[in-house]
């Protein structure tokens, strides 16, 4: 079960090189998670590519600091009534304060307890830099994203293997002239179908989300929907159709289906989301409050939600982060061990986790 | 020092110009003193200062002080060698980029060495050096040539004469070789920090192309030992 020892410390994510690093840290997180829930430890690890900033490669371990926002979320999740409609939690805060790590901590907690985890590492990746956009076969107005959908399906399959055998489809799905999934087949077949026929991957994602939503109200399993950068679902995209007209988010199948999942018209789980300005499109860098990042449409869609603020490090948290870096040999400079060095780090970073990590990287 | 050219002036004004002018000179009045950047000196109470330091403090009360250059910092983590190297890596005055490349290089060195540390068996763990600054300084020291070659013309022919090098020249040559090696002999897609960290670790272990270049220079100097008497300084 979750170890609530305060000495357990975190390395916040590096957000400077790009959001793919979020993905890697979260991918390696999912691998840590799945090691606890399932026994084969090597299999999940082999699938996720190791990025240069992978803490498992450098320190042979990946740790999270236990902080107040995460503990708050755990009490809420433990005391929530799963017969009521699902509660939405929005984690917000300034840049680099640890929102994504809090989300990862919650994902780890729920996976340890045996929930089904639908983790979208970065929703911003679905609304920008998409190489292949195809017209959806299911609905002529919508657009499919085969690459992103198949990537997500692969990660979903690795993290939730045993659920895929238990959940059965409740209706027949026809994928094409020759492919179809009968009623009562395990959900794993839908995922396989999405992975083998990449053209149907987005529709497979939609089917998976729909089935999980319908069946979790019955109460046999709990579902955690963890979305990082939920403000991407209601913003603008940088994608363009073939006639150069801009694409709005609801025209993307993945975004459309995810929006339905984040609604509070189902029960038996929780929805924990994070706002992120770093990957967001057309938002000023000073915007960090929910109203500014979500916009009117997003706020109305997510309303009512429980906001959770993640502040900068307190004195105690800064101390523990500093001592962890010393312990795992990350701070190598001789002067970094002195009081002067510590005070200088504290002043220069302003107790911001991201700044502290950036400063201590070359030291 | 350089000789000024006065191409457009009339002969009377040309006679007024001095024969040699200083190229690098300071506009400060000679009475201006250098600034003191060392924090520890200011934290010592007055009684503990030695005689000359007390005199210096009194002088400072009377004389004006020069402005501190932006490259000096009172941070405990600042290192003059690293600053010099960063300046040499800088192109078109883009210090921000040069500094970030240097930070990434040091980080890469640290990561590679930490990986090696964790992979090594317990008795060898002590020998793996993880401090990127130690590796940087040692690598530079290993790359410094001891003896250099200088061109001297005698009787129409130019000879390569072995010549002792000053400390500054040695440091400059080591840094210059390191940077040119990393800029030229790398694949188009590899980034500078990656290549630099690789070269620094190799130089730390006394292997790699820069150490070879140093040995080639030493061998040339050894081969031209006969002309050493041409040197007059």
From Swiss-Prot, chain B:
Gene Ontology biological process terms in this record: mitochondrial translation; ribosomal small subunit assembly; translation
Gene3D superfamilies recorded: Ribosomal protein S7 domain
A GO MF term: mRNA binding
Pfam families named among the record's database cross-references: Ribosomal_S7 (PF00177)
Keywords associated with the record: Mitochondrion, Ribonucleoprotein, Ribosomal protein, Transit peptide
Location(s) in or outside the cell: Mitochondrion
SUPFAM superfamilies: Ribosomal protein S7
Family recorded in the similarity comment: Belongs to the universal ribosomal protein uS7 family.
The name this protein goes by in its record: Small ribosomal subunit protein uS7m
Lineage: Eukaryota, Metazoa, Chordata, Craniata, Vertebrata
